Amino acid sequence: MARKSLIQRNKKRQKLELKYHWIRGSSKKEIHRVPLLSDKWEIYVKLQSSPRNSAPTRLHRRCFLTGRPRANYRDFGLSGHILREMVQACLLPGATRSSW
């Protein structure tokens, strides 16, 4: 189980990212549209003034049961060992253990 403070910090980052998502996206599009370098610098300053944690690269994909940040499977939203346990207990429909 991950520390609760880390999980809360990640949730706070997700909220910030949602809040600034449109602003960051429109600024980046505007950079490519504006031909003058001086105007581009103004837009860059505007982008850099947004909070650091509002960038999507600061987010971690975490297991929604344990909060573990590593070995996550996107399709299920689970970490590897929880996924394995759930497949063995037949709790995930359509998932089978491989055997060869």
From Swiss-Prot:
Keywords: Plastid, Ribonucleoprotein, Ribosomal protein, RNA-binding, rRNA-binding
Stored PROSITE patterns: RIBOSOMAL_S14
Broad class of the protein's primary localization: plastid
Molecular function via GO: rRNA binding; structural constituent of ribosome
GO cellular component, one term: small ribosomal subunit
Record-level GO BP terms: translation
Family the entry assigns: Belongs to the universal ribosomal protein uS14 family.
Summary of the function given for this chain in its UniProt record: Binds 16S rRNA, required for the assembly of 30S particles.
Quaternary structure (record): Part of the 30S ribosomal subunit.
PANTHER family: 30S RIBOSOMAL PROTEIN S14, SMALL RIBOSOMAL SUBUNIT PROTEIN US14M
Protein name, entry field: Small ribosomal subunit protein uS14c
Organism field: Cuscuta exaltata (Tall dodder)
